[in-house]
Amino acid sequence: MKKRTRILSLLLAVVLSASALVGCENDTKTNGEVKEQKKQNVKAEIPATEYDLVSAGSSKYFILIPENPTEYESYAAEELQLFLKEATGAELAISKENEADTGGSFLSVGNTKASQDAGVAPSYEEVKSNGFVLKTVDDDCYLKGFSDIGTRNSVYEWLSYAVDWEIYASDEIVYTETKDLKLLAFDQTVVPSIEWRANNGPSVYNEELTYRMRKNLFEEVYLHGRLVHNSMTIVDPTVYNFESDEYKDWYSEKIVGDRPAQLCYSNEEMREVYIENLLKQLEGAKANVVILGMEDNVEWCSCEKCAASKEKYGTDAAVMIKFANKVQEAVNEWNKVNRVGQTPIKCVFFAYYATVEPPVTYNKETDKYEPIDESVILQEDLGVMFAPILASYSQSFTTEMNADVERQLLGWNALTDNIHAWTYAFHTAQNLIFKNTFEIMQENYQLLIDNGTSALYDQTNGAQKVPDTGWASAQFYVQSKLMWDSSLNVKELLDDFFDHYFDTASGTMKEIFNEERSWMSHIYNDLGALGRIGDNLLRAEYWSYPYLKQALSQFEKAYGEIEVYRESDPERYKQLYERITLETIQYRYILISLYGTNYTDAELLNMKYAFKKDAELLGLNVYAEGVSIGVLWDEWGIK
């Protein structure tokens, strides 16, 4: 695995259980113990063994990996080596099994022969693709998943107990430094609440952050990565000319841009070519899921067959289900020949716009949804990507406003227990304005989990190449934590994040954040905003001038609170200064856009150029979905 520059921050305040740390004689141990007793997010206590993993900053242990390690097994071992050295000063050698003395003491990472001999062999049924086992046997310890992705995740869990390791952002990683460390008596099986967990935003451009947050790259889950609306790449209308008599019936009559809006999923000839082309793309696939992706628009085919299906089932989804069942049947046959000894490839299709409604009926007697007929039940290996793009994300899916969303989810769960979910946590029209999903995130995640969701993609602003304004770093952290363990206390997660990420300015920044959460609730509950991703929130009736000015004055207080670092730690000061400045961006954007007339021409021009300078310094590159921030400079009349 190619290594990237790592920016580390030493622990500012230890808040985790003292049982996870042995041999660190300082006040933070006691303080951490007291604080932990008051918290809900408490880790299990793991007793120490008699064995010294590190003593006086040195170790007799080494890290054992398989003779032929996978990329992720090697990466996991390197991460373990790195952070143990950072925390203790001891650099454990990494040794392949064919080169190592397995009679010595070791930390085994991945599918080693030693782990098999020790009986550490987690099955898929036990830990799925992302879970793992941590097991101490005598003076050795085994870190192992069913997959190497699970093994990668196991290292961060192990570190969290051994040295209180935690990551809040790519440049905010904390741990407790100690020169003496006992080996802990691990006997844990860890399975995430959601098997596959993904976002975009920072994780698009920083693989290392994704791994350390125990998230998944899209490419780890889905064959085509982020190319999810991919039907026209499988049956290309320029190759199979949609204007010709031979192929025109393969596509919908409606045109979007310069090509058909959708494929005609009831056309059997098209389906055979689709299957033939798709199977070619499966060769050598690393991911185990392929998305049968409709195009990204609201249109659907209205040919006689498709229209008749909609008339019968009340939704266009029935045509898609029958098409996808046939594709999955063909993929299953292909798996038997081409995926022997490997995880079989499964398909998912979109429940999105025209296909979001499941073909089900409601049985009042049983209080459950049922398929209209057996032909619309998804076969075992087929799944659905439930993407409620028209939902309100200001309220949970269980509220009256989102009654249709909950009904749709329950309906799909009546057809399959293999649901992948795509939810939305950003504004398409104004990327720079806070999208507050903190109030509903946990409840929505739990509802999805309770109804068969095994994969979740909670979409944020994927085009922004750096952490976004509008509290996006806090959002990314909490999303990561709740996807892994949906039972965690959100307030404690936020308190922990702010205390580390904003350091001495934590209290003020948290106050600004919570005030904006309340203000956003006012916008949604009292002023009529729907909470949808396409909302236009850049309206004067939503934002009062006094509120914006008050928030900006609070940021000045936060800048003052980090002055303690200006001379003593200039690098930390710069880091905190930029983090605070990033959060000012959305307020300044709204103020300039809506209340520019409150200032003289000269004052407004200076405000715009100061904004531009900070935005460029921070690396912000877009301000709306698909719209470069350079367009904003043009609109503002600045260069």
Predicted regions mapped to residue ranges:
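Acidic, contiguous N-terminal accessory segments
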Residues: E25-V133, K179-D187
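Structured mid-domain segments that build the active-site/substrate or prosthetic-cofactor binding neighborhood
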Residues: Q262-E272, K280, E400-G507, E511, ...
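C-terminal motif of bacterial Sec signal peptides marking the signal peptidase cleavage site
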Residues: S19-G23
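Bacterial N-terminal signal peptides that target proteins for export
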Residues: M1-L11
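Feature activates predominantly on carbohydrate-active enzymes
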Residues: N68-E71, A76-E79, F83, Y124-G314, ...
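Catalytic domains of carbohydrate-active enzymes that cleave complex glycans
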Residues: K481-K639
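Substrate-binding cleft/loops of secretory-pathway carbohydrate-active enzymes
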Residues: C347-P388, L432-T437, P467-Q475
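Aromatic-lined carbohydrate-recognition surfaces of secreted/lumenal glycan-active proteins
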Residues: A324-T361, I419-F426, L456-Q459
